[in-house]
A protein has these predicted regions:
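Short catalytic/ligand-binding loop motif for oxyanion handling, primarily in non-cytosolic enzymes
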Residues: 220-224
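Non-catalytic substrate-recognition and accessory regions of acyl/acetyltransferase enzymes
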Residues: 1-186, 204-212, 226-306
């Protein structure tokens, strides 16, 4: 297998990868081409995972860890190389399934999000969440507008009845969605556009025309209302949902999403250079906790039903 290909070079440029990342990834890809044993071992991992269909991803990522040690490459970087080498295979599978090429490029944009997160948190080009891509490569998770969506089920052991009287029960079909760290503001227009696009893709699963979007995220932490600015897009995003449950913990596990590499600092040393960081730093310094929530949106294709 040729590793540094025109497809992968164009892939990195299409998403405007940082120069340092392109330089690092190009070096490693060319090394795989030049060092046959190294390249063959990587090929075995990529092909073992992708054929006949993606499965047991962690098994192959464990192999990447061993390669990183054997060939003295950063684990996060080599994980990303593994993902890059999967992308042209995924591209062909989109074509085979008749999935629009635009959807492929929109969906694969997530790799840049994770790349930037890794640079900000680990100070190295790569990814520290390579396993996240199993859903993408199995053609189960797709980007439609600002968000990423996939088929899910309501998996709580209690029923939930919305304000409009819709009941969710264990095992009921829902559409889960995720919020990539693309930096695109969560405005009313952007959110509604994503819901409408996803509705068109999944409406065949909901014969009565009513779709249930489900999300679990730190963004749905209900106490945001106590300390985020009134006009915050996070609060607007939260207002789309009916909250099913929420929790908070002494150890704010999602702090890295806000503070990047500084998330492990004492609270009195957390940076305050953005409005979100400032609000969170002040909240945590006052002895409060961070948390997350799970919620549902009832959608009829045009509007949220409340």
């Amino acid at each position: 297998m040729l590793h540094y290909t025109e497809f992968i070079a164009d892939f990195m440029n299409r998403y405007d990868y940082p120069a340092e990342a392109i330089e690092t990834f190009t070096r490693v890809l060319k090394r795989l081409d030049e060092e046959k044993e190294f390249g063959d071992k990587m090929d075995k991992l990529v092909e073992g995972y992708m054929y006949p269909w993606p499965d047991n991803m962690q098994e192959y990522l464990n192999g990447v860890i061993e390669l990183s040690k054997e060939y003295d490459e950063n684990e996060c970087t080599l994980d990303f190389i593994f993902l890059l080498l999967c992308t042209p295979i995924v591209y062909e599978r989109y074509k085979e399934r008749g999935i629009p090429e635009e959807t492929y490029w929109d969906t694969m944009a997530d790799l840049r999000c994770k790349l930037i997160e890794c640079i900000k948190c680990e100070e190295v080009p790569g990814t520290f969440v390579a396993g996240w891509y199993n859903g993408f490569f199995k053609l189960e998770r797709f980007a439609y507008g600002r968000f990423q969506f996939e088929e899910c089920t309501y998996d709580f052991n209690f029923d939930f009845v919305t304000k409009a009287g819709y009941r969710l029960t264990a095992g009921q079909k829902t559409i889960g969605f995720h919020i990539p760290s693309s930096g695109v503001p969560l405005t009313d227009e952007v959110r509604l556009d994503a819901y409408k696009k996803a509705y068109q893709q999944y409406k065949h699963l909901f014969p009565d025309g009513i779709m249930y979007f489900w999300c679990g995220s730190w963004l749905l932490y209900p106490r945001h209302k106590e300390f985020l600015p009134e006009k915050s897009n996070i609060l607007k995003f939260m207002s789309d949902f009916e909250l099913i449950c929420w929790s908070e913990a002494e150890n704010f596990h999602d702090a890295w999403r806000i503070f990047d590499k500084y998330s492990d600092l004492p609270v009195d040393q957390l940076p305050t250079d953005t409005s979100l960081r400032k609000a969170y730093a002040e909240w945590l310094r006052a002895g409060n906790k961070g948390g997350s929530g799970c919620g549902v949106i009832v959608f009829d294709g045009e509007k949220i039903i409340r």
